Amino acid sequence: MAKSIGELLVREGLISEEQLEQAVAQFRRDGGRLVNAILSLGFITEEQLDQFLHFNLPVPLKIVDTGLSEVFLVDLLLKAAYLEAGTFTLQRMSQVLSLPFSVVEELIELVRTDHLAAIRTSSSYTSSTQVLELTQRGRERAEAAFKISLYVGAAPVPLDDYAFVLSRQSVRQIELDKEWIDSSLRHLVIGDKLLRQLGPAFASGRSIFLYGPPGTGKTSIAEGLGKGIPGEVFIPQAIEVSGQIIRFFDPAIHTPIEDKKNRGDASLDLRMNLTHDPRWKKCHRPVVMVGGELTLDMLELRYDYSSKFYEAPVHMKAGNGVFILDDFGRQRIEPRQLLNRWIIPLERGVDYPSLHTGMKFEIPFDQITVFSTNLNPLELVDEAFLRRIRHKIHVQYQTEAEFKEILRRVCHKQNVHYDSEVAEYLLSNYYLKQNRPLVGSHPRDLMEHIIDQAHFLQLPPTFTKEAIDSAVANYFVEL
């Protein structure tokens, strides 16, 4: 990972290959961060680095700035106006299409010139207050456009722009350290050895395989680290590929960051009121987790033959973030099928989605992919595939000290007094004597049994030997 940010600087022409090699040598010799080595050697200034790391997307002022054709945008505007019962305003169209007033004004001028719309009412000389209405010709063209695609919404961004931004805000340029991993996992009880493995794995920005028995916290670890990934990324609302539209932004996955200047109906009137191209939303890095419900078609572009546009696949929506495949091996598809789909993306860092026409296109495969499984990895995949997964980490059962600490935290969270003697009683009688492994999820589950019983008896829950005996009797299966 450390070198990847340097590679981006080389690609942008900010430093040379030779300078990168010198910086990497110093970084490996002295430690710290690669960017600090680049700065200390004087290859770039702090201002240049800051501009590089916190780039922005310029606001389009004219149709040509959008990267889309006039015909495409006019059809999109006509469809949006058609759904407004044929009457519309500049402000409303700017809001629906996520385009600045200046671009929509240019589009409206085109539709008026072609007699596709006419001014209905105007309270002043400003175009922003004019109410326009589609002409019969405009309605007919809108209906024809609907036959091509029912998509109405934010104007898409061109594929090339999406691919560039995806590479520019790569998850591999994030520099993570021990302080970050400690902070991200402070809510979990994890041994130092495991922490020392997890830190470099996530910091690499590469694929990770978490394996081990159930209940040991693999999913919680992946989620905690995923949600702790720092940084902001630009997410397109939609993408245009050869005239086809891919709906991309998903509110269930992408969490926008409040931006007062890019918010509200009136924010699109002037360039000075926009911080970036409104077709993009500034969001936290996405974290996507799928489990047994995953099927092979969920990893492909989904074309709706009735609406005639695409929905981006789930892993594509995780771009510049973290994709967690939980319970790997429990899916309805064979693990080998799933892994064959991802051999090239994991190995080469590119993916090749396919349109329903058969056309394929290339996009960067930029995400931290985490496989989590309770099964033996060697029974799921062959060694050749495991070699393509950079980090393989065995998450083992908890130690006695870790188990007790989890018990203490669970009691504290439920406002139940923790008794160390009761904890010793639980371990001695129900784990050590019975040679039962110390599973990290058991304290939470046992406490839930204790609380259920206390609620039934209309008593406050207590962490006592009697409560433990009752909870254990209902929790473990004895044959």
What are these regions (language model features)?
Residues 1-65, 102-114, 118-131:
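Non-catalytic accessory regions
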Residues 341, 381-396:
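A short helix-turn-beta junction within AAA+ P-loop NTPase domains corresponding to the substrate/partner-engaging
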Residues 69, 166-195, 433-434:
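Dynamic helix-loop-helix/coil hinge segments at AAA+ ATPase domain boundaries and subdomain interfaces
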Residues 186-371:
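Conserved ASCE/P-loop NTPase catalytic core
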Residues 390-403, 416:
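Conserved AAA+ ATPase "SRH/arginine-finger" region at the nucleotide-binding site
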Residues 84-96:
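Short acidic, hydrophobic short linear motifs in intrinsically disordered regions
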Residues 102-174:
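Interdomain "pre-motor" coupling segment immediately N-terminal to P-loop NTPase/helicase cores
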Residues 407-469:
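Conserved AAA+ ATPase small/helical "lid" subdomain
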